[in-house]
Amino acid sequence: MSDFYVRYYSGHHGRFGHEFLEFDYHSDGLARYANNSNYRNDSLIRKEMFVSELVLKEVQRIVDDSEIIKESDESWPPENKDGKQELEIRMNGKHIMFETCKLGSLADVQNSDDPEGLKVFYYLIQDLKALCFSLISLNFKLRPVKN
């Protein structure tokens, strides 16, 4: 798993500046999360933690099972006024990067030129976000047990 890396970014430049959500997993177990929103003067939220090899294997399994590596973003909608999404994956000797506009719902996916490929991307992102949010929530809410 020495060449494993996954990074997701979703963001835009709007009236509140550069707002984005980004997270990544590294082969050494480092997992990072950043969320920047200037709405109501919110500030940048950054979280870092180390996850076990088992968690990394689960992330890799999720990516493998999605078969996203077989897809191409050539026919996907490009970045627009609502922003963009990026997914970068390095695993099994392959390095691939996808970029498309922000997708609000499955209707956006179905109305695209490549609904099947974009559906793979859409559901993979949902799975990766759910895992990331769960890990962040658990890691920063748990308190060590005192003897």
Curated annotation (Swiss-Prot):
InterPro entries named in the record: Mago_nashi, Mago_nashi_sf
CDD domains named among the record's database cross-references: Mago_nashi
Regions crossing the membrane: none
Main subcellular location of this protein, as a coarse class: cytoplasm
Presence of the UniProt keyword Nucleotidyltransferase in the record: no
GO cellular component: cytosol; exon-exon junction complex; nucleus
Location(s) in or outside the cell: Cytoplasm; Nucleus
Listed GO biological process terms: mRNA cis splicing, via spliceosome; nuclear mRNA surveillance of spliceosomal pre-mRNA splicing; RNA splicing
Keyword annotations from UniProtKB, A to Z: Cytoplasm, Nucleus
Keyword Cytoplasm in annotation: yes
Signal peptide per UniProt: none
Family to which the UniProt record says this protein belongs: Belongs to the mago nashi family.
Protein name (record): Protein mago nashi homolog
